[in-house]
Structure formats: C-alpha cells, structure tokens
Regions:
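Crotonase-fold acyl-CoA enzyme core
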Residues: 138, 202-316, 350, 358
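Glycine- (often His-adjacent) and acidic-residue-rich active-site loop
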Residues: 115, 147-199, 250
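Amphipathic alpha-helical segments at domain termini/boundaries
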Residues: 47-107, 111, 278-312, 320-331, ...
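Conserved CoA-thioester-binding segment of acyl-CoA-metabolizing enzymes
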Residues: 2-9, 13, 24-25, 29-32, ...
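Charged catalytic carboxylate motif
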Residues: 122-126, 196, 203, 303, ...
Length: 375
C-alpha cells in the first residue's frame, strides 16, 4: 500500500521494477551473482553485497515518488544537505530470513523542493561529489538524476530550476557563510563566485555510465541544461514542464545546454526554446525528440528502474564505448581523446598488445607472426 503525503511507502518485497530483477548482472531475486561475489565488498563502501536487513533499515521517504523498500542510503554521504543519494537494492524475505542485495543503479536527487530544487555552489559541490562516486563504482551502470518533492510550500514539483538567483553575484553564484542562508547578505566575501555546474555537465558527459534524467516537475534554466546533457530523459505526464529561462535573467548556456539541444530538436526549435522562453509540456518535448518517454507521475520510479534493469542486461564495455562514440561527433578533439583512450585500453586486452609489452620487458624482439594483417 502507498501511504499519503511523505509517509512511509511499502509495497511488499516484489522484484524491483515491472520487468522483474536485474538478471543481466546476475542480480535476480534469490540467485547469486556470477559477476559480483555476494561475499565481496562493494567498491567504495564497506560491507558485503548480500546483507541481512529488517524494516528499521529502510531509509526515510525523501519524496512522494520514492519507494524506501527499493533503496538504501549510500554510506559515507550522511552529511549531504542539498541532495539525497541512494543505491538500488532488492530485498527478499522468506523461511531462510531476510536478505538485501545491491543493484547496479543509484538515485541522485536534488533535495531543495521548497525552492524548486534550485542549486547553489554548495549543491553543485555535493552533486559533483556523488556523481564522481557513482563514476568510480564499478558495480553501478545507471545513474538516475531527479528531484525530490513536492514543495512543502505549494505542492509544486521540480526536477531542477537552475541556479538560485538570490545568491548570484557579478562573478557567478556565491558561497554563503551560513549554509541555511537564503539571501545575498550572507554571501562569503572570501570566496569567488562559481559557475561550476558546467563541470558537472562535463562529468555527466564523460562518465562511462548511462545518466537518466527523471523529470518529475520543472526543468528550467540550468536544470533544463542538465536534462539535455543527460543520456536519456523520462518525464512525468502530469507535472513535467520544460522552460529555458536563461535569457530572462541575463544568463545563457552557450555550451552543451544550447548546442546539444539543437542536435536533439533542430536549430529552429532550439532557438525558439531559448529566445521565447515558453513553457513546454512533457508531450511537446517527446514529440520534438528531447524526451525518451512520458509516463504517469506515480510510475516515474518504475519506469526509471525499468530503464536501469534493461541497461544491466547489456555489455558494460559496449555501453561505455557507445556513449563515447555518440559524444565523439559533438565534442571535437576532447571527445576524440576520450574515445581514443578507451580504444587504446581495449587494444591492451588483445594477445597482440600483450606480445608487444612482454617482448619489451623480456628484452627481445616481438614475434608478430601469429597476428595477420586482417581485412
């Protein structure tokens, strides 16, 4: 049953997502993982993959669309104030006791619903930190980027509404001396302004994971650009709204936020979105090619986890190389460098490359006779 408001949501302990468990990585219910030893430690965290659990281990319900039975808080991030960070899990209970197993998906959510999940420099610091942790977690294949809600003030929903204009200075968004401050009078004069959300965009673009924007409400300004930079986007039919407000506040995303949008929806439509700053629905964005799926609001989590389940059935190496290949055409020499590095690493795995290395270390001439000039 689903409790009303932000109370605990409990649906029982069915497999995660409408398509069942994450079978591709050996994480279906009750089955040991051939890729991940249940007794092994999680990369970047302490403790085994398979754990005993009880109801007291469930995390708080951080959003109305968040099902605590499907998630656990990621250890080491208890100090987050502007975000929440959770790892997908499958939980079972039976005659042999209750067990919990990690799934290859994480949920990263803006947690400032009272200001439409606007970001400040502190928010961006946290966002980079958790995304980089996900990047370095070798058992995570999908990152769900979303926004908690609704707003306690008016019940409105937001994915992210961009930079918090209250603390924007002449040189960028400013740190405040008091993390809870809401106005410019608390700005810390010792720290320069920031626009490092662009560093987050680059991280999303280059991390070898599929980043899915799960848009449950407003995606505006810098939040609109984050959805554009993400690999995939799922939007709420009832509450998702898209609006590029940069020009309204004397700002502009002249990088990924505009260039990639033009790739997705075409030059004329992208210019309309920026120049006119109109509000667009999820159905509009779907028709234009800026969104992959539109689902009912209460199905957002199911749909996002289904994406993650399907991605987990694919080759991690193939997903990695496909992402970098898609990026290559738009990222110039920087994109070529990323792709070239990954291609070189793949070449290192061949017997031919091993022969070259071993010959050097053994101070002999390499024997290439077993490696034809294939065509």
């Amino acid at each position: 049953m689903r409790a009303s408001g932000r109370g605990l949501l409990v649906r029982g302990l069915a497999p995660c997502g409408p398509g069942g468990g994450f079978e591709g990585h050996g994480l279906s219910l009750g089955a040991p993982s051939p890729r991940l030893d249940p007794g092994a430690a999680r990369p970047g965290a302490a403790g085994p993959l398979a754990r005993v659990w009880d109801v007291s281990d469930l995390p708080p319900q951080v959003s109305e669309t968040f099902d605590p039975t499907r998630w656990r808080a990621v250890a080491g991030f208890e100090d987050l104030t502007d975000l929440t960070y959770h790892r997908g899990v499958e939980r079972t209970s039976g005659p042999d006791g209750a067990a919990e197993r990690d799934l290859p998906v994480v949920r990263v959510a803006f947690d400032r619903p009272e200001v439409r999940n606007a970001f400040r420099p502190h928010t961006v610091d946290e966002l980079y930190r958790v995304l980089d942790h996900a990047r370095m977690s070798s058992d995570v294949g999908t990152v769900l980027l979303t926004g908690n809600g609704p707003s306690p003030k008016d019940g409105g929903w937001a994915f992210c509404s961009g930079g918090d204009q209250r603390i924007r200075g002449r040189d960028g968004y400013r740190y405040t001396s008091d993390p809870d401050a809401e106005h410019a009078d608390a700005i810390d004069p010792a720290r320069a302004g920031r626009l490092h959300i662009l560093e987050v965009q680059r991280l999303i673009r280059t991390m070898p994971k599929v980043v899915v924007a799960v848009v449950g409400g407003w995606a505006a300004g810098g939040g609109h650009s984050l959805h554009v930079v993400a690999d995939l986007t799922i939007a709420s039919r009832q509450h998702a709204r898209f609006m590029q407000t940069d020009a309204n506040v004397g700002s502009f995303d002249g990088g990924y936020g505009s260039a990639l949008l033009a790739r997705q929806v075409g030059q004329k439509r992208a210019r309309e979105i920026f120049f006119l700053a109109r509000e667009y629905s999820a159905e509009d964005a779907l028709a234009w090619g800026a969104v992959n799926d539109v689902v009912d609001h209460d199905q957002l989590e199911d749909a996002a986890l289904e994406y993650a389940r399907i991605i987990a059935t694919k080759s991690p190496q193939a997903i990695r190389m496909l992402k970098f290949a898609f990026n290559l055409a738009d990222d110039g020499l920087a994109g070529q460098q990323v792709f070239a590095g990954e291609a070189t690493r793949l070449a290192y795995m061949t017997d031919e490359a091993v022969e070259g290395r071993d010959a050097f270390l053994q101070r002999r001439d390499p024997d290439w006779s077993g490696f034809p000039y294939a065509y």
